[in-house]
UniProtKB/Swiss-Prot annotation:
The keyword 4Fe-4S does not apply. This is 4-hydroxybenzoate octaprenyltransferase. Disulfide bonds: none annotated. Pathway: Cofactor biosynthesis; ubiquinone biosynthesis. It is found in: Cell inner membrane. The lineage of its organism: Bacteria, Pseudomonadati, Pseudomonadota, Betaproteobacteria, Burkholderiales. GO terms for cellular component: plasma membrane.
Amino acid sequence: MLARFPLYLRLVRMDKPIGSLLLLWPTLNALWIASDGHPRWPLLAIFVLGTLLMRSAGCAMNDYADRDFDRHVKRTADRPLTSGKIRAWEAVAIAVVLAFISFLLIQPLNTLTKELSVVALFVAGSYPFMKRFFAIPQAYLGIAFGFGIPMAFAAVQDTVPMLAWVMLIANIFWSVAYDTEYAMVDRDDDIKIGIRTSALTFGRFDVAAVMLCYAATLGIYVWIGVTLGFGLAYWAGWAAAVGCALYHYTLIKDRERMPCFAAFRHNNWLGGVLFAGIAAHYLLAGTAGN
């Protein structure tokens, strides 16, 4: 069992934290906004750990669902499940255990948060199969990756206001943007095996679609900033996020594999500076209030 532990870590992508960060930033945005910049530390710990666990569970389920496809894709052919180093039942068991631990984590929280967690579990578990039927599965991924937003508001306020759903919509656009960049890396392989992705659906308009999704995401965050009366610190973070999006254009415009993958990974910075702007606004507002 211990000898297989490194394989299990690879299965759940512990060696590749970018996916966890892409889930974490919008969740932190929601926690900070819902609590006016003062989230309780136990609640913060629950959401951070829960995000890491559910992302890991999602990776295990994704590899299980795609095990017959991944062996035909250059980037994924050597994954533990695809290469036969672990069995399919092990991946499912790991996903179930991680999801169960995540559910235990939220037991101290209110009923609404627990109810939303059931929806989140269904969306996360069903996402890997959307690539067979849905032309833009990245939009469904945005719901799965962003469901921590309504859950955060529910945990803090015991309600889910319209603002939370607007933030979720922003996350859907952002997910389509960065996961289309990711799909552009595997475009040739996906054509051969018949997987549906946004990169194939958008076709020659893929770069334009990515940039429009960035524009929609950041446009929604303009509305959020204006509606909540955010100050200069927030807008500095927002401007830095715009700069990240423009930098991504320089990476993806020629549709080359490695630059597209670099653009995908760089979205960690886009999410990070946007959160930094939100956190800095509340920090400075609290300091000014004192």
